[in-house]
Amino acid sequence: MLRDNADDAALVDYCKALQQALSRESALGEPVRALLDLKAVKSTNKRWSWVKKGAPIVIEVGGRDMAAGNVSVIRRDRLYRADGKLDSVGTPKDAFVGGMGAMLADIQQSLFEEASARLKANITPADDWSEVEAHFAEDNKTPGWLDVRWSRPTGAALDHVVERLKALKLTLRNAPMGQTHPEGQCIFTGEPCVERVLVGRAY
């Protein structure tokens, strides 16, 4: 956080040394990539521009941080405290650098678990076509996906499925990975199913 005063040069040197130290670390099998942002804009605008770009960690350093040998750390998976304020944690610089690999791995796992939970919460099983029609007929702006049995039809049978889905503004989205062979009949054709697929609305 530059203040346009005599301390700025020392602060930039402190940050460049931090950047070099971080670049010597590795995480998740890759070298750590650290970018030093010296743009002359408000610190809040700069911070949120990096959050919006998906940076897993935003580091802010001011004069008091430098004097104490610290950095202020904002993790993408913990942006806010319980009181709604920004969760910026002051951390000794050397400890932060040494723990960078573990912190990035922890953030990756945390974001993965959050995304997995959100995905599962938005998938609903459906056992017949009437359930599909009823689900997407509801006044729901975020209907998510339906998990249905599928026989992989081809030719005219597939064309018929596509037309039925199109009438509800739906498409086949994907087949979940790691699924076991399901039992029962395809909800579209009545043939034995070979997998389960997700059906959703295309926007």
What is the predicted function of each stretch?
Residues M1-Y203:
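NTP/phosphate- and nucleic-acid-binding module
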